[in-house]
Curated annotation (Swiss-Prot):
Zn(2+) 1 binds at residues 63, 65, 150, 315. Homotetramer. The lineage of its organism: Bacteria, Bacillati, Bacillota, Bacilli, Bacillales. The modification N6-carboxylysine is found at residue 150. The keyword GTP-binding does not apply. Its cofactor is Zn(2+). Catalyzes the conversion of allantoin (5-ureidohydantoin) to allantoic acid by hydrolytic cleavage of the five-member hydantoin ring. Belongs to the metallo-dependent hydrolases superfamily. Allantoinase family. This is Allantoinase. Keywords: Hydrolase, Metal-binding, Purine metabolism, Zinc. GO terms for molecular function: allantoinase activity; cobalt ion binding; zinc ion binding. Carboxylation allows a single lysine to coordinate two zinc ions. Pathway: Nitrogen metabolism; (S)-allantoin degradation; allantoate from (S)-allantoin: step 1/1. It comes from Halalkalibacterium halodurans (strain ATCC BAA-125 / DSM 18197 / FERM 7344 / JCM 9153 / C-125).
Amino acid sequence: MKRFDLIIRSSTVVTETTTYRADVAIRNGIVSAITEPGSISSDDGPAIDGTGLHLFPGMVDVHVHFNEPGRTEWEGFASGSKSLAAGGVTTYFDMPLNSNPPTITREELDKKRQLANEKSLVDYRFWGGLVPGNIDHLQDLHDGGVIGFKAFMSECGTDDFQFSHDETLLKGMKKIAALGSILAVHAESNEMVNALTTIAIEEQRLTVKDYSEARPIVSELEAVERILRFAQLTCCPIHICHVSSRKVLKRIKQAKGEGVNVSVETCPHYLLFSLDEFAEIGYLAKCAPPLRERQEVEDLWDGLMAGEIDLISSDHSPSLPQMKTGKTIFEVWGGIAGCQNTLAVMLTEGYHKRKMPLTQIVQLLSTEPAKRFGLYPQKGTIQVGAEASFTLIDLNESYTLNASDLYYRHPISPYVGQRFRGKVKHTICQGKHVYQDH
């Protein structure tokens, strides 16, 4: 009988604190041994040669929309999780909206879990929704195991997940705090965005720059300021999604100093693309909050390098191809398909271009998401006793992303055509070999 189910030989292990060469052995989905390279016998189990490769903990993507049930023509657990595996992600948190019906009751949560259990290639958790009228369902959703709750402070683009006015937010946050849970927030001012959008359309200002100006940074700041005050009032932990500007980070940093229990994420598209690229790529790069000026991108990197951002998520938000076409930027679907490319962006733009330490990339993509949501040290690190979920990476392999490389149901993405350096070669999830580069 073999001692181990799988051995990763002679790779450079990267954790949140250090790097070192080792053999890593897996048994029953758990890291069973970490030893000097070459010290485990070839008779002890099947092996992957990690020579020249780096072994990262599996990424934890806390923000994806896989649209199942009800909108599997947009994505789905099978294609979405395969894309994640190809990008080095071994755990994802699926958002409650863009499936139909949304995950705002225990019944819908149970249906979604059954589908994911049947189809998902990697591990998962689910967000429950906070919407007007469902506060009485929060307890049942929590008992059903949601990782937290999600609310929108502005309209989300579909009619089946309503945004939350102040009363819903305050009542919901009080309940969520009592449950010991957390609220994730899409923070843009609904009234400001609607007013500026109406004015832009009336004046026939319909370029991508006009779209960005209709959702200005100040709309994020106004909403973030409000939700931080509500967090103080209710003692509710909050997680602010997809921040696009360092101006917002500075206010969140101040709130942390005041004792507010708040974390913040940004997304790879805000770290790679600016308004200039938005104009070149077109509607595929529409998202909310929108892409910003190049200086805002660089400032966001400064904040990231300085530790002002807790974690990186993809906010993978796919749609039918025809939803990305239309007469004006204001009419098309706002969402970017990108969950397969988060690590590639961070290695290319972070490690290679800006000399971000690999340990910091692990913190942002694996460790801090796991810690914030109570999954560490089972996930988010590589150590004996931890879950055997990791990805083997060739840091120096360069490639141009082609649509044929993507595993999404619809291989359309603003990342297509981008040049990346650093490629996932293998992904292991709970001891199972779920992806191998060809």
